[in-house]
């Protein structure tokens, strides 16, 4: 290399490598070489780099001209090694142009007479082209040979590329464990060279491998790491954004995935990538938007992908895009015989590279054919889908196979086989959920079982017994409470980040705080999402109906389920018997709930006269809400306490405000299984009490002060002493705890719902650090009982995590309430708890003791949750 023939920062022989990590810089430097007095060898490097940049931007014609010009220069000056290298580059460009035969001819020419090390570097690139054309065995052979030669020649950079290609081929062949080992070795090699860009590519590939192995926490951790590395390098390839969106979707993080998909579309619209890369990216974004409930956006993106693929002759990619268009159209209501036949035809045409997409197409064809009377086509499509995927592939693919089996059985009128297939599919998803160490992921992952659960529940609601309906409702409800809780462990990194979050939260008035808070929250979520399960794997706790009926005693349990586009169905368990009752229209409930909460919110903080007017105006709406949710169930309630198990979307109903429930002992539970666990749990032998007053709560001093006089041995934290760490220490293992603090419900991010303490917010993530949760906990914070519905029928929030951790009884509110009124209520509740009442009975006493309208509104806004 001659000085002066390159830019001041880059030598000519470094330009081809720079073309991948910094294409703009490489292009500028290459043009500077070509416009100056370059030596022939430097000219070949510059032309090769320019060709790589043009290739990656999708400018295939220009790339071919640049590389061929480099070959001519090399031949004219007898630069044999450079010609070999450039012919390999030519083969890669020709492959991207879809010209398979000329591409392999270029590689044959490059290999002819090449020295061993040169030959190995050519084989690395030919392996990549073999992979591109789905010749996985060819890619494996070339990569294996190249890796062995390059190891002998002590060339770690190229050996890393060879092993990365080998891993990709093994991944495509389904040999995941071998692929993972090769990727790990490739990363080790490339890290030793200091090539940060290539190292980042391998981290990304390891994330894709982990995803295919079904290890979503590890996949998220690796892809988040890859994205961070790319950001530091200032280069964000669309592939990493695509992979992250796909894995976020698989993890149930639909909103996150939709945001990532929008970023992907923006990257693709602003980039000049190859048609295939653009097509793959647009398809991924379309699938995410389809899952996020935006079929119109999904269809537009999929059509864009289809056009791009068609122009370049990428048939499989075009077929895949057309499948997504059909799925989006079906979601939007286009259910016709033409659509069914089109889906079946596309499924038949997709190659093995698109096996997962073929499964989706088969299930779609089966559903559409069944709905439009094409029973023979439906049976054929569903049989193929069920046979191919029930026992292999990722958990989500296996569950889809069982869904196909269930649809097949339903179309054949085999009720028993249909329910069995639904159960097997949900079993697969339980195992999948157990692999996730983050509770948020466990809750959100249940969305993948929604179709299975809905299919079975709809059927038993029509022709099943009350016992069947209860069992199937419990089968997919309250998963966080039915699966073993991830073992608590010390996590220094998480603790430090939560401390930083509190520090930022306490800096009131700083304009920079909000952006910093968002950054810290994102780091926390990414860290927790990458957490893997610690400890032995066990199974889901199943409901024992006999045990439930025995435990109820004189109580009545009402399990409510809302069917899509239908009515609320309830199973009433009382006196050792079960009864199925049909209530009101499920579509009418949400508006009534919001109106009821609006009225209570106003009345709970108003003067008594105004509160009375607001409550009187709310009465007709509360009566309508009762009729919608319960209807004839009211006549089945008996005289004893009532346990309500509503859908997650109805957990925040102010149940104590409903006319038939105001004068009853009422508790609410996320599932019958959760209530039974709470009811039969053993209180701690050490009856320790924790009393905690939060920050900036004018009435909390009086409340906690009075309670401290009642519980003379309690741990009392007020003022600056009420820090997060001190509160957690006091809560851990306590028999009874009371926190009077302002609460903040985060609908945008429920795991950051919090209680305001002296040093900042105590979040759900903090609560999950408890080794042993309090047996009973009273939360007088505003909206402390509100959670975010997610997944199939789950809630995320403060009370959900506490009850899933093992807290047997909780008192919380569903709307903001008056601090002063909640103090009076708290004192009544504590008085009754000390006499031996459970929380439901204690809250009933508080409702009865409420003298004025504002006090009644406050009492109606509280829920007793759990079973103690």
Segments from the language model and where they lie:
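Single-residue signature of alpha-solenoid repeat helices
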Residues: 26, 63, 103, 139, ...
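Caspase-like cysteine protease fold
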Residues: 745, 750-773, 819-868
